[in-house]
Amino acid sequence: MTDNVSAVILAGGASRRMGTDKSMLKLKGKKMIEIVIESISDIFDELVIVSNSPEKFDYKNNDFKVVSDKLTHLKRSSLRGIYTGLTEISNEYGFIFAGDMPFISPELIKAMISEMRKDKWDIIIPVISGHYEPLFAVYHKNCHYTMKQQLLHENFKITDSLKEFKVLELTDNYCVQYDEYLASFFNINTPEDLEQARKYLGKTE
């Protein structure tokens, strides 16, 4: 288990493009959210799920906490989910994950946490092919104070948050050392993505 870092999974609810809650889609007979949990449960001693529909996660004997989005009078956004998760963790850092990432690399997670321990970073975030990956990133818990002010000003861009913090950007070349095909950053946005994931696993439902 990793001391001082909690896992936060954002399971935001219905997707416009998928027409359903992506975290509830199935691969190999398991819900997407279950695959994510299994991928990371041996690494973290605290797991928080942020959801607009917490009743979907009312599992018996679970080892995680489910919380509802805060600031619900504001536009739904990933930044709002990150903010909510960081306010709920008991550890100093939160590793944020999307609930629709079925190919997470534990080795890359551990490497990123190791980088966090080398210096007092506020955020450690991969930049893959020039694009930030804020839903596979490490955040200091105290980032939520600045994020709240940004949300209250109705600015929902996560990249704008980065300007306010001490940020370590991890390049493609860094990440491929621990995740050869960068599969950790594959998420399910469309039915075509779901079919691609099923083919990757070599089995359809």
From Swiss-Prot:
It is an enzyme of class 2 (transferase). GO terms for molecular function: GTP binding; metal ion binding; molybdenum cofactor guanylyltransferase activity. Its main location: cytoplasm. Its cofactor is Mg(2+). GO terms for cellular component: cytoplasm. Disulfide bonds: none annotated. Keywords: Cytoplasm, GTP-binding, Magnesium, Metal-binding, Molybdenum cofactor biosynthesis, Nucleotide-binding, Transferase. GTP binds at residues 10-12, 22, 69, 100. GO terms for biological process: Mo-molybdopterin cofactor biosynthetic process. It comes from the Bacteria. Its EC number is 2.7.7.77. InterPro entries: MobA-like_NTP_Trfase, Molybde_CF_guanTrfase, Nucleotide-diphossugar_trans. SUPFAM superfamilies: Nucleotide-diphospho-sugar transferases. It catalyses: Mo-molybdopterin + GTP + H(+) = Mo-molybdopterin guanine dinucleotide + diphosphate. It is found in: Cytoplasm. Mg(2+) binds at residue 100. Pfam families: NTP_transf_3 (PF12804). HAMAP family: MobA. The N-terminal domain determines nucleotide recognition and specific binding, while the C-terminal domain determines the specific binding to the target protein. Transfers a GMP moiety from GTP to Mo-molybdopterin (Mo-MPT) cofactor (Moco or molybdenum cofactor) to form Mo-molybdopterin guanine dinucleotide (Mo-MGD) cofactor. Belongs to the MobA family. This is Probable molybdenum cofactor guanylyltransferase. It comes from Natranaerobius thermophilus (strain ATCC BAA-1301 / DSM 18059 / JW/NM-WN-LF).
